[in-house]
């Protein structure tokens, strides 16, 4: 398995955009649209896991997430997805580790993540900060992890 950190100039950008847009998770369409619109700027990246030459998972490293602007946390890991056929192989853990290494290399001591999932990210070492309002009028859990 290979993990690539990508900008829009990466050879696999279009392939991962297509994969995200067609995956079984509805948020994949949101990521694909952001990729098509070239919304990843500066140090923001999409990370993709490839197995046998095809994408099987992805996540993103971004400055902002869906929290209200009054919360000044950054950067974020988001859009964590692994294809159902490849789950149980620790691919999401490897994606998270790749993002942590990238964040550390870029001088960030922590990475934040929002999620409605209970108990999922704690197993990777994330610590819950609390429940925070989002731009969508919902409340999400906010987690952090040292990079």
What are these regions (language model features)?
Residues 37-43:
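Short loop/turn motifs at secondary-structure junctions and domain boundaries
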Residues 79-82, 88-101, 113:
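Conserved acetyl-CoA-binding loop-helix of GNAT-fold acetyltransferases
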Residues 48, 54-65, 76, 81:
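Conserved beta-strand in the GNAT
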Residues 124-132:
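Conserved acetyl-CoA-binding loop of GNAT-fold acetyltransferases
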Residues 1-34, 46, 50, 147:
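Short amphipathic alpha-helix that is part of the acyltransferase structural core
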Residues 103-115:
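Conserved GNAT acetyl-CoA-binding A-motif
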Residues 64-77, 87, 135:
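A conserved beta-turn-beta hairpin within the catalytic core of GNAT-like acetyltransferases
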Residues 112-117, 133-147:
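C-terminal "cap" of GNAT-fold acetyltransferases
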């Amino acid at each position: 398995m290979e993990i690539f950190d990508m900008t829009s100039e990466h050879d696999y950008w279009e392939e991962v955009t297509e994969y995200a847009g067609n995956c079984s998770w509805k948020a994949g369409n949101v990521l694909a649209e952001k990729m098509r619109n070239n919304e990843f700027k500066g140090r923001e990246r999409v990370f993709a896991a490839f197995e046998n030459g095809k994408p099987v998972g992805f996540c993103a490293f971004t400055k902002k997430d869906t929290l209200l602007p009054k919360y000044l946390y950054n950067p974020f890991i988001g859009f964590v997805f692994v294809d159902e056929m490849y789950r149980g192989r620790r691919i999401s853990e490897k994606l998270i580790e790749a993002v942590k290494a990238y964040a550390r290399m870029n001088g960030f001591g922590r990475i934040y993540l929002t999620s409605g999932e209970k108990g999922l990210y704690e197993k990777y070492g994330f610590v819950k900060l609390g429940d925070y309002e989002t731009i969508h009028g919902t409340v999400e859990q906010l987690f952090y992890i040292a990079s």
